[in-house]
Structure formats: structure tokens, C-alpha cells
Amino acid sequence: MTEFIPPGSLFHALSSPFAMKRGGQLHHARIAYETWGRLNASATNAILIMPGLSPNAHAAHHDSNAEPGWWESMLGPGKPIDTDRWFVICVNSLGSCKGSTGPASYNPITQAMYRLDFPALSIEDGANSAIEVVHALGIKQLASLIGNSMGGMTALAILLLHPDIARSHINISGSAQALPFSIAIRSLQREAIRLDPHWRQGDYDDTHYPESGLRIARKLGVITYRSALEWDGRFGRVRLDSDQTNDTPFGLEFQIENYLESHAHRFVHTFDPNCYLYLSRSMDWFDVAEYANGDILAGLARIRIQRALAIGSHTDILFPIQQQQQIAEGLRRGGTHATFLGLDSPQGHDAFLVDIARFGPPVKEFLDEL
């Protein structure tokens, strides 16, 4: 498979060699990013958005790409992240397949795809690469750093590794470390990919592609991204119409099964399996406690920013709400004016993407007060 790069992407050439936290280095690597709004003369109105595992840098439409982005309702003129006021940057994570260098990219030294020769990937690598983009744009300090899901982890790594890089922070459905439940789910996702006979130790192609493994991995993910409450409301126990079923033993029968199948089928043609493995494992490894002798609150207290907001959904089972509470508590211990907000959204972990009616107002209020 090839990379899936949105039109209108911008690229930053990383320092070469680019050292990786867990060993190894990249040569002539790049980070894909997109921007909205205008940077003011003093370069003090910049906001950096760090996305989750699967999104690209196309958070919203712009002149070079009119397609709606994955955070279209949150970002733009007059929206909660108001691009009439803010210069907004969104990067595609290092290790992804959406424009930034990752396992699906070609190694300039060997002229072959990295595949499993790509160095072990950490959240900190994504943090360091993103800040190179910020500095290249002439920005010394961000007005705010926003991270959601995996991006919430990356944002915390940025704040730990690059003191004074931001005046404020919004952490949305993020965490300071992976919990056992989340690690277990991601372990099953990776196993589904690796056990697909077409995976071939990462050496697949379009003819022999681990579609079944990636499809199952995505289904597991989607189940954890939403909540049982939402599934009940949307699908109940409604069965498919007779023309939607087939005679396959134990095949699709319920609408929820068909939804998962359709969602997964779309995903496998837009994401590289090896990239999925690398990014997934990087989340398992991340732990703020490593920065304070095993004390996660002390690790968070090492972060020095003026203001912070941690937001979560009460129905999130992948990044449960106590993890956002923990972020706010740890930041307060370090002297940050940090606020925690738990929202009653039925849409689980994905609520920040789809429930803008609940998540938008607190983001807008926080940024308006800066």
C-alpha cells in the first residue's frame, strides 16, 4: 500500500539524522501539516493541534483543500477555535501514513519501504518532530497546545520535553499513561493484523494485503471509541433486511454488525497496517510517570504552563474520565491554573469529534479568555 496524503498538505523536512527515543534514527524524514488563519507580526497567536492515531493533518477545509476535515465543526472562522483570531497548525503524527514519514514511507538510504525496518516509535518522537514544525514557522511560544486522544499524550510529551513552548494547554480525552484495558484492546488489534497470513512480517503488497486483520482491528477500535449507551440508542437489536443478508453461516444479521463491517471496510483502504502497529504500540509505551521516578502526578507537576483545561466524556471506556481528572490534578500540583470538565455525552471516546455541541463551548470559552 502507499501513503494517503491529503491535497494541500505542507511538509517540513526534519533535522537529519533525526534521533528516535528508543534507538535508531531517520534520515531525510518529513512531517506533513496544514495551517489556518494568519500568524500575527509578533508570532504570539499560534495554536498547535495534535491529533489521534488515525486522523491526518486535514482538520478543516481551507483554500488548498475544500474537503471538510475531521474537526470541521470545531475549527474555522467564528468557530470554537476561531481562525479569525488564531493561527492554527495541525500536524500528521510521525509514523503515520498520511504524509509524515512512517513505515509506509520509502527509506532514502535503501530506496525501499521502511516496513518493519522503521525504528521503534515513541510518543516523544512525535512530540519532538511536531515542535520542529513550530520552530520552522518562526514561532517561539504557542498561545495554546491542543491534543486529543493519542494527541493528548503527545501534547503532554511536548510540554515535558520543551518547557515554555506553550502558555496554555487543552487536553481532550487524553491520558498521561495507557491503562491496562487500553493496552489489552490494542494488543488484540495488533494480533489480528499480525495473524493475518497476508501480513507476512510486514512485507505485504496490494495483491497480498492483510485486509481481514486490519478490518478486525478497526472493528475492535470502533467498539471502544463509542459507548454501549449509544449502540443501544442507534441500533438496538434491529436486524438487517433480508436483501442485506446472505446465506453465510454465522454471517451478518444485526444492524450493528453491518455498521462495524461498513466502517471497517472503508478504513482498510485509507490506512497502512504497519503504521497502525507502530502508532498503537507507541501509545502503550507512553507514561508520564517515567519523568518522576514512577510518580505520575509528580511527572505532570513538572509541566509549567499558565492555564490548562482537561475535558473528557463520562462514557469513554478507552481513555476513561478519571485520566482527564488526573491530568488536571497533576498540572495543578505544578502551579498551573487547571480545570477539569467531565461531559455527559453518550458518544464515548469519539465524542470530541462528533459532539461539538458539548465539546465546542468549553473550548471556545477557554480560548476566548486567553
From Swiss-Prot:
EC assignment: 2.3.1.-
Pathway per the UniProt entry: Amino-acid biosynthesis; L-cysteine biosynthesis; L-cysteine from L-serine: step 1/2
Any matching Pfam family: Abhydrolase_1
SUPFAM superfamilies: alpha/beta-Hydrolases
Gene3D superfamilies, alphabetized: 1.10.1740.110, alpha/beta hydrolase
GO biological process: cysteine biosynthetic process from serine; homoserine metabolic process; methionine biosynthetic process
Domain AB hydrolase-1, first and last residues per copy: 45-354
Any one GO cellular component localisation term in the record: cytoplasm
Molecular function per GO: homoserine O-acetyltransferase activity; L-serine O-succinyltransferase activity
Binding residues for substrate: 218, 350
Reactions catalysed according to its record: succinyl-CoA + L-serine = O-succinyl-L-serine + CoA
Principal location class: cytoplasm
Keywords of this entry: Acyltransferase, Amino-acid biosynthesis, Cysteine biosynthesis, Cytoplasm, Transferase
The keyword Glycosyltransferase belongs to this UniProt entry's keyword annotation: no
Similarity-based family: Belongs to the AB hydrolase superfamily. MetX family.
HAMAP family documented for this protein: MetX_acyltransf (MF_00296)
NCBIfam families: homoserO_Ac_trn (TIGR01392), PRK00175.1 (NF001209)
Function: Transfers a succinyl group from succinyl-CoA to L-serine, forming succinyl-L-serine.
Subunit structure: Homodimer.
Protein's recorded name: Serine O-succinyltransferase
Species for this entry: Xylella fastidiosa (strain M12)
